[in-house]
């Protein structure tokens, strides 16, 4: 219900604003999505799916002296009961903004780096996009002509389990209509 959603978003923002060095908020938002989709294809598949998705988002501004930094946190769940709590989202957004304070620019150099989970997921999104059939067909992929070539170091592995249920991106069947 709308009132409960507003209360959760306000709680998230309030908890975040109570943290040290958090100067302001770009807002907190709770959104809920519900849809019903019907799929049909030439393989004889006709299926109706009911989907829900719930998101809680908080964006903050941290300030120390004259320096200001922004950061955000969010939670996503298919079931509203599994959504990350307002407290956890607010506190994590505050922590991320606070951690950026005092950051500095480095001179260009070659050195080992460590990516945060958020950064690494963005890199994998780019990789998966480059592997997509449509980009290969349109010849717009930076991995064009990479068939049978390693595109990641041997130390990196990608795991996919299409049979998981109740996970983001899960489907009851693939694009060819093959049921899981």
Give names to the regions the model predicted.
Residues 180:
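Cation-handling catalytic/transport regions enriched in His/Asp/Glu
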Residues 1-171, 175-177:
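Active-site bordering "gate/hinge" segments
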